[in-house]
């Protein structure tokens, strides 16, 4: 709008300038006729040219303003009115997640039962027969051990009961020494000592009721001596004059 009004004003000024210039030229050409027409004619012609120029300027129509773009109002979303006669559907309950199926345990195989051995039928023997059987077993054991003692040169009788007792004691101590084991911990700590073990001997030479009668001061050494006596085997029947209660010293010494 502003550019168009400026162009119209510029055009009017240019037209006025050219009209003035044309009238000036016309005035020079008609200078000689001024005397005849007089000064009033010049004024009239100039006045006419100015009116013509103004008329041309007024005849130009003013440019119409451009119409503003129509404002489009955004359509508001229509609110849906709930029908009171229609009942709303109840909301669906969310489905519960299915629990994962547990893997089925394989049935455990039952251990096969071992076939039971048939028990030997024990006949009820009278007391007299039982005593006979026990006496016979004792006699058999005595004979076998007796054979062992006769083969042992240390237990052969020399006609003196004292010598037989001493020989039996020496053989008994050697049997205990065979089963003696020095405890590793006691050896590392360089523990030493002598343990006296007292035990009972029956007529067949079987050891029982072993106990510590004198300690070495070390529990490990005492237990090792007691185990050695309990592991000793019978060396034969007791000789005449040999007591049933016997005490044997068991020595633990470290030799470099």
From Swiss-Prot:
Subcellular location: Cell inner membrane
Transmembrane segments: 9-29
Biased composition regions of type Low complexity, renumbered to the chain: 138-154
Residues on Periplasmic side: 30-256
GO cellular component: outer membrane-bounded periplasmic space; plasma membrane protein complex
PROSITE patterns (UniProt xref): TONB_CTD
Region of interest: Disordered: 59-162
MF terms in GO: energy transducer activity
Membrane topology listed for this record: Single-pass membrane protein
InterPro entries: TonB, TonB-dependent_transducer, TonB/TolA_C, TonB_C
All residue ranges annotated as the TonB C-terminal domain in the record: 167-256
Annotated keywords: Cell inner membrane, Cell membrane, Membrane, Protein transport, Signal-anchor, Transmembrane, Transmembrane helix, Transport
Record-level GO BP terms: protein transport; siderophore transport; transmembrane transport
Cytoplasmic-side segments: 1-8
Biased composition (Basic and acidic residues): 89-112, 121-132
Function: Interacts with outer membrane receptor proteins that carry out high-affinity binding and energy dependent uptake into the periplasmic space of specific substrates. It could act to transduce energy from the cytoplasmic membrane to specific energy-requiring processes in the outer membrane, resulting in the release into the periplasm of ligands bound by these outer membrane proteins.
Alphabetical list of NCBIfam families matching this protein: tonB_Cterm
Family designation: Belongs to the TonB family.
Protein name: Protein TonB
């Amino acid at each position: 709008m502003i550019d168009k009004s400026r162009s119209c004003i510029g055009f009017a000024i240019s037209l006025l300038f050219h009209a003035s210039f044309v009238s000036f030229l016309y005035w020079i050409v008609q200078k000689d006729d001024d005397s005849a027409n007089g000064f009033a004619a010049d004024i009239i012609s100039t006045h006419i040219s100015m009116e013509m120029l103004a008329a041309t300027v007024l005849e130009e129509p003013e440019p119409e303003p451009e119409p503003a773009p129509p404002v489009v109002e955004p359509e508001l979303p229509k609110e849906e009115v709930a029908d009171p006669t229609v009942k709303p559907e109840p909301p669906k309950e969310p489905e519960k997640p299915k629990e994962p199926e547990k893997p089925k345990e394989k049935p455990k195989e039952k251990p096969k039962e071992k076939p039971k051995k048939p028990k030997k039928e024990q006949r009820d023997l009278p007391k007299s027969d039982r005593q006979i059987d026990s006496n016979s077993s004792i006699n058999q054991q005595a004979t076998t051990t007796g054979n062992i003692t006769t083969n042992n040169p240390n237990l052969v009788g020399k006609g003196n009961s004292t010598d037989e007792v001493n020989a039996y004691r020496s053989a008994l101590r050697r049997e205990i020494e065979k089963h003696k084991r020095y405890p590793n911990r006691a050896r590392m700590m360089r523990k030493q000592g002598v343990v006296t073990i007292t035990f009972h001997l029956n007529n067949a030479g079987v050891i029982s009721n072993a106990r510590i009668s004198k300690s070495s001061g070390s529990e490990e050494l005492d237990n090792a001596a007691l185990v050695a006596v309990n592991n000793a085997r019978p060396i034969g029947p007791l000789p005449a004059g040999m007591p049933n209660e016997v005490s044997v010293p068991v020595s633990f010494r470290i030799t470099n």
